[in-house]
Amino acid sequence: MNVIDTDDLEKHTPMMRQYLTMKAEHHDMLLFYRMGDFYELFYDDAKRASELLGISLTARGKSGGDPIPMAGLPYHAVEGYLAKLVQIGQSVAICEQIGDPATSKGPVERKVVRIVTPGTLTDEALLQERQDNLLAAVYQGKIGFGYATLDVSSGRFVIAELDTRESLEAELQRTNPVEILYSEDFGELGLLNGFKGKRRRPEWEFDYDTSIKLLLAQFGTKDLHGFGIADARLSLQAAGCLMQYVKDTQRTALPHINAITRFNQTDSIVLDAATRRNLELTQNLAGGRDNTLAAVLDNTATPMGSRMLQRWIHQPLRDPKHIKARQQAVTELLDTAAHEGLHEQLKALGDIERIMARLALRTARPRDFARLRQALGLLPELQQSLSTLSAPHTTQLRQHLGEFPAEQALLERAIVDNPPMLIRDGGVIREGYNSELDEWRGLSEGASDYLVQLEAREKERTGINTLKVGYNRVHGYYIEVSRLQSSQVPLNYQRRQTLKNMERYITPELKEYEEKVLSSQGKALALEKQLWEQLFDFILPKLHELQDFARAAAELDVLSNFAERAETLGYTCPELSQDIGVQIEAGRHPVVERVSQTPFIANPVTLHNQRRMLIVTGPNMGGKSTYMRQVALITLMAHIGCFVPADRALIGPIDRIFTRIGASDDLASGRSTFMVEMTETANILHNATASSLVLMDEIGRGTSTYDGLSLAWSAAEYLAQQVGAMTLFATHYFELTQLPELMAGVYNVHLDAIEHDDTIAFMHAVQEGAASKSYGLQVAALAGVPNKVIKAAKHKLQQLESRDHQAEGTRTPIQSLLALPEPVENPALTKLSSINPDNLTPKQALDLLYELKRLS
């Protein structure tokens, strides 16, 4: 019943009319409606909250003639429930009581004061500290897509113009947004499957002119040329929608969102969605973080450093100058052992990046200011540590750290050493910071001494030995006397409360003092909140410089982390070459070597202009996939400035990394395993270049032998002769090992294994040449296939091999392929393939039909 017909509102009680009106304004999210010490949910919201949160579903009387489904949760536990809801992509509007129940006629005045959505979180308790929290918007044009992401918790705003569906899929995989806005006309909803927090927005929110006005107003500029994005029309439309959504949900100024950058695919190595998934960069195939490249490389000191590292992993650089700048910084940190002390210093900084976002939104809490004070206090020591380093990139980062002595001194004077969680109850501002506040606090805090003196004086005056002076929050100050002695109280004692064995009284003097104290407490709290707001005003003029400080500290953290990982894990600095190629000596898989229970077998790889494709053969479980992945991961690590697990690595320029490794049904899109495999293969064949690194594993296994072999052969041939990409091509089709005899630049390598009787030992060592056999039956036995089945399979294998040897004149599959004549070009088909029917008039179409008839 959450869609409201305003004509029916009069049927409901005044309170429910108020609720339903607010719900109509926030129809696409749960409405937490404050009633006393609880947040209540009604109707469909109550049913959904009961299901999602496991809270009781009850009913609250009737309104409009029907029982009202209701669910509630205590206000003090709301953050825990919010965390659960945003994790599953649910948005919440929080409606608070802003009126005074004592003076209200009718329902207490209420207002939605906070909107919590997965992509607009800034509260520390609701965020994953080592993951970016991205809000995204996507807009589809006639050709291509506009894509924008915004991290409200840091202010990072990025747009991208994407030409193809595959590019958008890769960006979604790279950025992994927690909330996605899309237009009503968006036609690729299948790409959003698996993402939580999807929001369909009206088309007008993506209007180009409106978007430009919003962005110019946000950045305070006359145009967008300074950001280098003026021509990015589609992504600016997406960015405008994001900006409007954030303004609607945050309902405050957003000064920390002060720049926007453009993601250019040409600046980094392109990784498509399949590659990011198959290489398990920051997420494993089960959706977790364990046993990923990020899990191995991340020993950063700060959450902001961890988040930056993950962004680097997904954006390997192409410019060798930038890569070498990082390498030089890491080398110097390692050679001087400066990374050891730097790690501890950076760790004490905390998450300044997100603290600055909360300061900008004025939602920071007292402990945020305390952490900022600590970080600023550590800056001189950090600057001193870096002053001995001379690597250009480190020197540049040191300059961006800045100096903030005035701000640090202010926070030192203003904030107590261990502030409470919230400003609500006071106790945040340090004594001595403001004389007026000290005076009001003195009146309030002097109450204890006054009450002791009053109690002693009244005991002496009345002679009542059971007399006590006390205070509680309900009745205020009182004089308590035992019931047995209550007849002895003076006439100026006015009864305030009767208990079982006690009577409580108030006197004119005590009443006057109570009003004075309570007034001073209220005035002290009001003044403290005023001083608290002034702290924001003092700090925010330095917002941009403090954001630079946070970014520089995060990058220093990543570089220091690279030095530590190189030392701890035995990594070496890769060499960068201007010549295309990947040459690795004793390379290791960075993840497998960390989780393996046995010593990892290091292996080489050599790819260059004269050796562009390796046909990789060997048994299942022999290590083919591990070997191929380690080549890709070492190449990627080299391009983020990280040292690599190898004795030596020489890496040339790379434009893209492709992987076609493993496959499963894509049930959501209705695609079989073989269809998924062929789609990924087609993407590689269409987009790979001579500067690409391609990993192809078991192409063609999802269909018949002849079909599969034909596809594998043709794909390998196309990559070797037409594309010239650096390729590792793993296969169980041993016929493909004949390719090196037919094509230049193609070589065989294999993973070694030793067979003894019916057992097999995998050596995991890469050797030149083709494997002698596949050892499929031995692997099946290791997997636990029953002995009877293995014996029957051996018998059938012997029959097949014997028949092949005895069948005179028969051809092997590869011989059949090689014997086929080259296809003859058909002029009619050639002409037909060049026609675009959308561009033909009826007369032209008729003429073409006659021409095709003549050519056929």
UniProtKB/Swiss-Prot annotation:
Keyword Transport among record annotations: no
PROSITE patterns documented for this protein:
DNA_MISMATCH_REPAIR_2
Q: Which CDD domains match?
A: ABC_MutS1 (cd03284)
Q: Which GO terms describe its molecular function?
A: ATP binding; ATP-dependent DNA damage sensor activity; damaged DNA binding; mismatched DNA binding
Q: Name one Pfam family in it.
A: MutS_IV
Locate the residues binding ATP. Answer: 618-625
Alphabetic keyword roster:
ATP-binding, DNA damage, DNA repair, DNA-binding, Nucleotide-binding
Record carries keyword DNA damage: yes
What are the disulfide bonds?
none
Record-level GO BP terms = mismatch repair
Which Gene3D superfamilies does this one have? 1.10.1420.10, 6.10.140.430, DNA repair protein MutS, domain I (3.40.1170.10), MutS, connector domain (3.30.420.110), P-loop containing nucleotide triphosphate hydrolases (3.40.50.300)
Q: Which GO terms describe its cellular component?
A: cytosol
Biological role: This protein is involved in the repair of mismatches in DNA. It is possible that it carries out the mismatch recognition step. This protein has a weak ATPase activity.
As for family, the record states: Belongs to the DNA mismatch repair MutS family.
Q: What's the protein called, per UniProt?
A: DNA mismatch repair protein MutS
Organism expressing this protein natively: Shewanella baltica (strain OS185)
Q: What gene is behind this protein?
A: mutS
